[in-house]
Amino acid sequence: MSREKILAAVAKNKPDLTPLPEIQNFGNPYANLVEQFKAVLTAIGGEVVYVKDWEEIRAYIQTHFGGRRIVTNIDPLADVAQESWIKSDPHSLEDVGLAILKGQFGVAENGSIWVTETEMGQRVTPFIAETLALVIQKSELVPKMHDAYIRIGGERYGFGAFIAGPSKTADIEQSLVLGAHGPKSMLAFLME
């Protein structure tokens, strides 16, 4: 069969488009979204830090990450970053000790934070840094992934990811390795 015949047969057999099913909202099963988010993220190797404002984040970073290469695209934290990096070659980010990015919202069910390429600066940023810090408002937590999908369903973005905890992998001997495919540690700054 020629290529043209195959393509014509495929085009002729194309099913009608059907709309996506409605996503049902199952409500909030958690008594406290913040505590649920913290419990899950902590259980999977992340850390939650409660802060009131950008100044508290700045102080935390200076205390815990002084001397490391830091990148951020969050304007109120620009003074803790060491250089402009957003338009740099992504390979130049290989030695980043801490990347601080803003997340759009968090999911209490699995301790994840939704981040799009707009917040990432470069797509590689949340995956190449030794430590990833994501900043979200406490009020921006949703209970379940169903709620998260409802929230992102109408958005326009080229790339986005739900990021939950540090990178983890285990081999056949069940030896857990953190940081094999991404950051060794992850912080979530939950801001008032």
Residue ranges, per PLM feature:
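The feature marks the mature, well-folded catalytic cores of soluble enzymes
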Residues: M1-E192
